[in-house]
Amino acid sequence: MSSKHSDPLERFYKQFQAFVQNNPNVISAARAAAQIPESAKAVVVLSPYSLQHVFPREWVTKSYRKTIVERPERLLASSMGISAAITMYPSLFTLKSSHQRKGSLMAPHVLKVHGSSWPAELIELCQMADAKLLKGEIEVPDTWNSGDIYLSSKTIKALQGTIGAIETGVDSIFKGPSAEHISNRAFVAIRPPGHHCHYGTPSGFCLLNNAHVAIEYAYDTYNVTHVVVLDFDLHHGDGTQDICWKRAGFKPEEEPEDSSYDDFGKKFAEFPKVGYFSMHDINSFPTESGFATKENIKNASTCIMNSHDLNIWNIHLSKWTTEEEFNVLYRTKYRTLFAKADEFFRSAKLEMNQQGRPFKGLVVISAGFDASEFEQTSMQRHSVNVPTSFYTTFTKDALKLAQMHCHGKVLSLMEGGYSDKAICSGVFAHLIGLQNQDWVKEWGSEQVVKEIVRGCKPAWKPYKTKRAKDVIRIWAEEVIRLGRAMIPEFDDIIFKDAVNSAPSNSLLKATVEPASTSTIAQRIIRSHRSNASPEKELHENKPRSTEKQEQREIRSDTKVKQLSSNNRAAETQIPFLQQEFSSEDEDEEYVYDEELNKTFNRTVEDITIDDISRHLETLEIEKKGDEDSDHELKEKNWKNSHQRRLQGNGMYKIPSNTKPHRIRQPQNANTPTYDDSDISMISHVSRKHTTRSGGRW
């Protein structure tokens, strides 16, 4: 790890401060962080060590290298999605780095999942890999798919970092002096993914099963007894499901002979008890042609509840043509996962109560984004996917499940997602849902996503020309600067070649631009537009030659604000006067969409006005009698102290073809909102608590 950065988030803090200072419409929202308790914020855990797992075969062709989709750049793409969410809700997230925490592949919570043989073998293979690579030999065993999995000595450090990040995520939602000081939700951005890894067999980019390692750590450290795993990756999590069979007492094929099993390969089920609930493409890996054995297809289609200590439910993705058609699929088909997960938790509570034992639940999300509408077609060869809004809707349903059974505790672990667009947009929408906010259709538009993913280029640099009204491009560059500042190791691993080949005055490095010299522009909110001068309006309609002349006059007569080492622009009510620069890095296909920019801008302004009040509408669950009693749901709005009683008893119901009654539709929320999913789920919130989210913010 780089010793140049004592605090790995220092660069991000400074960039965030510049963002806030240059965006007066978010200053109040950022300051409001002091009034929001930690329990109401979502923790985002970054894993710098995960970057160390790099494709090591230097002798392969460039075309072959391009086929390696599980790469460090995936974390950069996720950082873009994280920063996009932070710019929208700057007071609702706490950012953590696990740079000082490396777990052990031989830790008890790893060995309980994978046994002692596989972690030891994996370490040995990584240690031997470098010598093989120097000889030009494939470093993985012949029985492995060398196109999917690669190893090097640095892979050990990456896996240690992944384990450490997982532990940090679990600690974040369970450890603290009081409930008010503990967050209820955490998203952990890690790689490589884990849900294809079996008890003793790696597969599909996965070397350890991250979800089960997290579950075992939560059980060992915080006495979690029952866990629901919700998996929305495009691919079936065959490894996660297989380990659920092991937890139920069934002998894994890879496990050595053990006398504790009976003649049928079964023994008593282990704690913690885990239910696995997945939606995936039945025609993609591991059930794609070439992998689609009869056994694999059966596994990816298993549906069994409360039998033989197993709770597994699989749903296959269907094609759709319009988002409304998808919403019908979601309500009538995919939400069945939550009904089954609810059934698992309720049965578990009843059983534990009958045994006189304490119940403690947790919801784990295997958050893969390769089912996104923005994923590359080579990954989605069978034309099934989900709209970006799905990631918000599904996550909000997961929050409700957790609120009903687990005191709101949700741990989300990044799984798949291999194109920059899929990861950026998916993480963005997922984090909006993780804070129970509404997804806005414009945020997931092609143009918005395209602008954000520009920041995933190692040699990214800001546009040299901007229109003052091009809100999307201005906002996207704010997002990019924040995202590229999140992990200092991006410089050494991803940006290195681009920086080394850049001229000395280049803007390629993800360096911080302080408020006094920042290119971060103010969002153009209505109050700014109303204060814009008539001269500015005339200016926008004048020829460029006239614009250039007037810009020179403005520079000579007014105070100027430095935008970069070479470029200056007048400091006006609305920044970024149109300027003449070379267009070597401009998007020639770009067409300014005035209506989209106006609509996008309105959504941004509306958030800054009411994000806190909307967020602090809390759902309190009051228990009557024992844990199995029905729950009374109350939603409190702190803004106006209005209290309304929700319909029903809060239980999930098996979906039907009948469209539910639609309740209040929030302004600018284009995703349909239904009475059985649109409720706030933030628990243990106190207005008296004033802990800041990372006091530096």
Swiss-Prot record:
Stretches the record annotates as Histone deacetylase: 40-440
Biased composition (Polar residues): 561-573, 665-674
Record keywords, A-Z: Chromatin regulator, Hydrolase, Nucleus, Phosphoprotein, Repressor, Transcription, Transcription regulation
Protein function: Responsible for the deacetylation of lysine residues on the N-terminal part of the core histones (H2A, H2B, H3 and H4). Histone deacetylation gives a tag for epigenetic repression and plays an important role in transcriptional regulation, cell cycle progression and developmental events. Histone deacetylases act via the formation of large multiprotein complexes.
Name this protein carries in UniProt: Histone deacetylase HOS3
GO molecular function: histone deacetylase activity; histone deacetylase activity, hydrolytic mechanism
Residues the record lists as Phosphoserine modifications: 582-583, 613, 629
Listed GO biological process terms: chromatin organization; G1/S transition of mitotic cell cycle; positive regulation of transcription by RNA polymerase II; regulation of transcription by RNA polymerase II
GO cellular component, one term: nucleus
Main location: nucleus
CDD domains for the chain: HDAC_Hos3 (cd09998)
Annotated segments matching region Disordered: 525-573, 625-697
Localisation: Nucleus
Similarity annotation: Belongs to the histone deacetylase family. HD type 1 subfamily.
Subunit structure: Homodimer.
Active site: 196
Catalytic activity annotation: N(6)-acetyl-L-lysyl-[histone] + H2O = L-lysyl-[histone] + acetate
EC identifiers of the protein: 3.5.1.98
Other facts: Present with 4420 molecules/cell in log phase SD medium.
Keyword Nucleus applies: yes
Residue stretches of biased makeup (Basic and acidic residues): 534-560, 625-638
Organism encoding this protein: Saccharomyces cerevisiae (strain ATCC 204508 / S288c)
